């Protein structure tokens, strides 16, 4: 019952879509209506409002971090922490408050990894930054970081074995890659948007 309750709370935390909330508060168009239609920081950046994109990034990462931090703070066992990590991530992907239309989970996963172990989170974030800096593709950076996250976990803690948190990290990586399947097709076709590209979006209530 304790694990179920913790996972439910984590899912509800994850279901708060900061891309939609921040855009609404700042008078921007719903990020699900323009660009990639993904409610995430990269798509919010396409509105031309960097402040909104940063707030979205920080908010989405924070909810992943706080969910796992709270689980640790209250002394929950590793199996509960693993379920909390998965639940907050799934909440972002399929938010109950926003008709289950969520983001792809990059920032939230980063927050989870930082809470699991700061070195794991920072190593994964640095991987994202390096790829994004050289190639300017947020999706490619996310895919590479997702592949390396479980590898970093093995280097830090050894093979997963009976470690439920390590399996949760692997599960999030697989889900993140799956959520980017459309981006993979666009990357292969040379049609993927680069970081900073603006689409017809909405810094002012949906008007370009």
UniProtKB/Swiss-Prot annotation:
It is a multi-pass membrane protein. GO terms for molecular function: acyl-phosphate glycerol-3-phosphate acyltransferase activity. GO terms for biological process: phospholipid biosynthetic process. InterPro entries: G3P_acylTferase_PlsY. Keywords: Cell inner membrane, Cell membrane, Lipid biosynthesis, Lipid metabolism, Membrane, Phospholipid biosynthesis, Phospholipid metabolism, Transferase, Transmembrane, Transmembrane helix. It is an enzyme of class 2 (transferase). GO terms for cellular component: plasma membrane. Its EC number is 2.3.1.275. It is found in: Cell inner membrane. Pathway: Lipid metabolism; phospholipid metabolism. The chain crosses the membrane at residues 3-23, 51-71, 78-98, 115-135, 140-160. Pfam families: G3P_acyltransf. SMART domains: G3P_acyltransf. The keyword Protease does not apply. It catalyses: an acyl phosphate + sn-glycerol 3-phosphate = a 1-acyl-sn-glycero-3-phosphate + phosphate. Catalyzes the transfer of an acyl group from acyl-phosphate (acyl-PO(4)) to glycerol-3-phosphate (G3P) to form lysophosphatidic acid (LPA). This enzyme utilizes acyl-phosphate as fatty acyl donor, but not acyl-CoA or acyl-ACP. Belongs to the PlsY family. Probably interacts with PlsX. This is Glycerol-3-phosphate acyltransferase. The gene is plsY.
